[in-house]
């Protein structure tokens, strides 16, 4: 964690200028370094009373065990940082085939739908 601390500090400062402290935000977190840094920065902001945050991780059914490890890493990080974490499993490849979309477009549409569904279900 010490290696990303300067990046997290800088990100926190930027986020404070963009977001409202009384609002709740749902973060889409892939498990990559960038999205985990964002979640970490937002957890630090929440601890300071600057907004509240939840995380959504969507597993697209494309990368097998590697994707499941990413999902577990996101869940562990959220637990450590005190962020509620919601996960969804979707089948991007079959959705792409059924709707004549590229896999990338299908994954994006399914991810956005998952974010809308989670926000609505949990009144975020």
Indicate where each model-derived feature is located.
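Core alpha/beta nucleotide-donor-binding catalytic domains of modification enzymes
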Residues: 2-124
